[in-house]
Amino acid sequence: MLKQMIEFLINCWPSLILTALAAYLLGSLNSAIIVTKLFSHSDIRDSGSGNAGATNVLRSQGKLPALFTTVGDLGKSMAAVFIGGLLVSGLNSSYTGGSMKFVLVGKFLAGLFCIIGHLYPLYFGFRGGKGVLTTLGMMLILDWRVALICLAVFTAMGLIFKMVSLGSICAGITLPILTGIFGRLVDGNSAATVLFCIAMTTAIALILIFKHIPNIKRIIKGTESKIGSKK
């Protein structure tokens, strides 16, 4: 498997670069910024917490803009993963033969770079959101079981402790663990495939935690905004 993967990377790198670029550009379409400009002609990054995400839109702009933001963030990452799979399989059909393990590389790569685009959007001065909904959308395509359990963890922690950020952090930590459990113990995938998936989801989890460092500091101090707060 390792030898095949190395050969795949050597032979198919142009399509992988194209996939990463397309996903990044798609991810750079930050829904919170776009929706807020359309609804109130303002920049969401100048309101509330300053984060370009659905939670801040809900607190600062209301339910309808937050709904559009949520749909946009979920939709773009789902589209990116779908496009990534098509690009890698379509442009390298003679090499991959439609093998799912190679298509999986394209999908994960697209999801990762879509998240990076959301965090550091090219069109908006590289100041974006935290990538929680974008990650959820990606995982709904890659493994809906993992996505739904992570969503349940997010919801439970959020409701118990009244902090969206804590729910996001806990869901991020859970992501690579569940990926390994389902990939190996439930689906019986090869060790190499499972390790690749764990590596990718671990990278995403670390990105999510990194973006939540200010929240973690406020949680420790007891000053983090809670559900229902306008701050």
What label would you give each PLM region?
Residues 13, 17-21, 67, 104-112, ...:
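Hydrophobic alpha-helical transmembrane segments
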Residues 1-14:
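Short, strongly hydrophobic alpha-helical membrane anchors
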Residues 58-62, 84-88, 113, 131-161, ...:
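Interfacial segments of multi-pass membrane proteins
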Residues 59-86:
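Multi-pass membrane catalytic core of lipid/isoprenoid biosynthesis enzymes
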Residues 33-66, 217-231:
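Cytosolic, membrane-interface loops and tails of multi-pass inner-membrane proteins
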Residues 22-28, 33, 115-125, 157-165:
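Transmembrane alpha-helix interface/packing and boundary motifs in multi-pass membrane proteins
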